[in-house]
Amino acid sequence: MSSRAAVFILNQNAKREQGRKAQTANIKAARAVSDIVRTTLGPKSMLKMLLDPMGGIVLTNDGNAILREIDVAHPAAKSMIELARAQDEEVGDGTTSVIILAGEILSAVESFLERDIHPTVIVGAYFQALEEIVRLTESYGEPIDIENENDLQKIVSSCIGTKFSSKWGNLIVDLAVKAVKSVYKKEGDYVEIDVKRYAKVEKIPGGLLEESVVLDGVMFNKDVTHPGMRRYIENPRVVLLDCPLEYKKGESMTNMEFTKEEDFKKALMMEEEEVKKMCAEDILRVKPDVVITEKGVSDTAQHFLLKYGNCTVIRRIRKTDNNRIARVTGATIANRPEELQESDVGTKCGLFEIKKIGDEYFSFMTKCENPKACSILLRGASKDVLNEIERNLHDALGVARNVMVNPKLVPGGGAIEMELACRLMEFSQKIEGMQQWPFKALAGALEVIPRTLAQNCGADVVRVMTELRAKHANDKEGLYWGIDGNTGKIRDMRESNVWDPISVKQQTLKTSIEATCMLLRIDDIVSGIKKDKRGGAGQRGGDRGQGDQEETFGDQRDG
């Protein structure tokens, strides 16, 4: 009687965790990531010093920036870091809160898994709680007037008060509000505030931080192509191109064979004539002062544009910069010089000038009429300071944008989290069966934000949290009471003027709860061998004799 040999479906080098073990590993990984950024919450937060792979130093207390630099191996930890990135891209703020909340909510689940409560029951309770949280948060939102610049500055100031740049007063706040108002575009009910595309930050080391400014136009790191061209032009006529100003080369390789010297001269003459026609007839027909192109400009073209039109030419500009210039000057980017019309010329720019800052030349297009794009010029002592200020400015821009898109606020300082925790605890009494327990656990997990704020400024956590719970005991009575992040005492957030945009808070709560539910539903983690080893594994498999029974399907399929 022949016994059948065991068949291994998975590669023997693959590591596999299943069931409870996988879920516990995920919870531990998530908790480890949240512990890294826990001390960076609030105005008394600590900074983290990180060494990047290139040997540079990153000094920051921005949750996303910290996690971006950290190299982790566990897949659950990687998904937590992805949370911070998603939060940062979506609303620009709340990256630390979302990680701390997700870690705490997952920790609260561990005891239920030990009692053999099925993850699906917990996930169902969490989604039910999330619906209630969104409804309550919406009802607590207070509308504001975004036309009042003073109010807008107060809100942005309270949101970035925890950052490194808060030491310079309202400087970053003013820059953010001015930049967002510049790129704000409303057509009927449609509101567009594309900060990422149309508000460019230019960092130039040197000078004082107080010299930072939002330009009423744009700047870019380019100089003129010819030393004889003008570097200061008032009310310039601007032409933008997306094509090279040189003799057209064939799409494929082209060989030319000359038998007589005259033929070669004739070919050169034709080349020069074509460039002359392109410049003198097509471009100078619309009488431009400044010609900017994304591609190259030949010496011949520079000569003709300078000789016949006294034009200033800038070449090889980035497409993103070209789009910003089009927004501030009112010009249309042309793909072919012969297509240029009078309506394509930009006339909204009041001043074009080239300045030397440090060792580099920068082109400025300022005094623009109602610009819908801007450049933010940041000056500072060192690159480290500039990088941290830029991260803070990114958060401030995100907050200002969120408030203008959805002009509603909720109290900060952990007040809204404590209010939601108390209301969810009351709501859980109406729920019957096993789902009541995860509901209560989620309510308890929300308290992590005020608790962490109190911990980070060295307060008596137990006493402060008891006082805060007492304030929030009755519905809406203590809604505005939170933790003063500087003193660690409880305070009315209206007096402290600490507010959060409702969109940031809702996104934080949604992201953390949904991510928790996703990680809870994982019951199997398979980590195979690395890609570079797969080729070797496949070859070894091919050399085996017929008698070897091991089958490794997983590692040979993708070669």
Curated annotation (Swiss-Prot):
A molecular-function term among this protein's GO annotations: ATP binding
Cystine pairings recorded for this chain: C368-C374
Function: Molecular chaperone; assists the folding of proteins upon ATP hydrolysis. Known to play a role, in vitro, in the folding of actin and tubulin.
Keyword Lipid metabolism attached: no
Localization per record: Cytoplasm
Taxonomic path: Eukaryota, Sar, Alveolata, Ciliophora, Intramacronucleata
Transmembrane segments: none
Annotated Gene Ontology cellular component terms: chaperonin-containing T-complex
Keywords assigned: ATP-binding, Chaperone, Cytoplasm, Disulfide bond, Nucleotide-binding
Protein name, entry field: T-complex protein 1 subunit gamma
Family membership noted in the UniProt record: Belongs to the TCP-1 chaperonin family.
Pfam families tied to this protein: Cpn60_TCP1 (PF00118)
Organism: Oxytricha granulifera
Region of interest: Disordered: 531-559
Quaternary structure and partners: Heterooligomeric complex of about 850 to 900 kDa that forms two stacked rings, 12 to 16 nm in diameter.
